[in-house]
């Protein structure tokens, strides 16, 4: 959530940030500013009525003790209480209205994020490892998976519907091995391994920015205030929801393997075959909570941690700086890692490492204490890595002419 003080003090900065996202809201912002100003006036008036109520109540008590006439004071108290209740209700309603409107405004675009109109304006930062030159036409992962009996796509449809898969046999062993390898690498880089629930309440999804704006993308449990998590970013970040952390305990670095669930609303017709886009998938996530001065360095550290895994698996990849219009709702700056898929003859996203600055921390009330003062922390998140897409990349990059798959040395000890 953006700072309402900033909206009032530097309206143009907020408006410009939204325009950079192709999400202009000038009229809505102006109306919101008017509501905030009106709210502040009413709040001052409410505080005045409360002070008056306290003052008269004391006078009433003194006169009662003196057995003096209190009828006038009693009437004053009753009339003031009516005004107090009415104004208190109005202030509460305005507060809710402001919070709701603020909650659907995306994060401010970081100064380091380049201006762009769409994903075509994203900027390649660097490439790591050179794609292999094949002496045969490389197959796509779904062909290789079916040939080797590793993935049963029809079984997933039978059990659920499209965009679900069943992984079995040696494919399941590779899948499990990838998870173990990712967690080991992340732990080596200082991230604590944590297992969390796959269900969370509405407050947690508000904290990380999925609600209320993206309700249609999340699976909800009927008749319960519970949702299936779209990413472990939600659970790991919100472990510190409404928490004040001692500055000596920063940074907090966490990693988790979880199933993730997404409705993929708006993805009709995209990646309909294979494991690229699923309703349920596994992901190993990185989350960090840092001092504001340290979040940029942490973002680089998280990127290198994810890249280290891809290098160990001998998978060519590249870093891509997202432009302003391609940023996620909560992100201020995002760098994607894209892995080379020879079967598709292109790079595809396998990790997205985002610095949200204090945006999530303000929503989730994640603070740290320094010099006896509470301040908002910075939060970061990123995949390290998406397990299914890593398996896709492994199959396509390490396929042999006969359709068999070479196993990288780093993975052998996990099998």
From Swiss-Prot:
It catalyses: tRNA(Ser) + L-serine + ATP = L-seryl-tRNA(Ser) + AMP + diphosphate + H(+); tRNA(Sec) + L-serine + ATP = L-seryl-tRNA(Sec) + AMP + diphosphate + H(+). Pathway: Aminoacyl-tRNA biosynthesis; selenocysteinyl-tRNA(Sec) biosynthesis; L-seryl-tRNA(Sec) from L-serine and tRNA(Sec): step 1/1. It is an enzyme of class 6 (ligase). InterPro entries: aa-tRNA-synt_IIb, aa-tRNA-synth_II, aa-tRNA-synth_II/BPL/LPL, Ser-tRNA-ligase_type_1, Ser-tRNA-synth_1_N, SerRS_1_N_sf, SerRS_core, tRNA-bd_arm. It is found in: Cytoplasm. Consists of two distinct domains, a catalytic core and a N-terminal extension that is involved in tRNA binding. PANTHER family: SERINE--TRNA LIGASE, SERYL-TRNA SYNTHETASE. This is Serine--tRNA ligase.
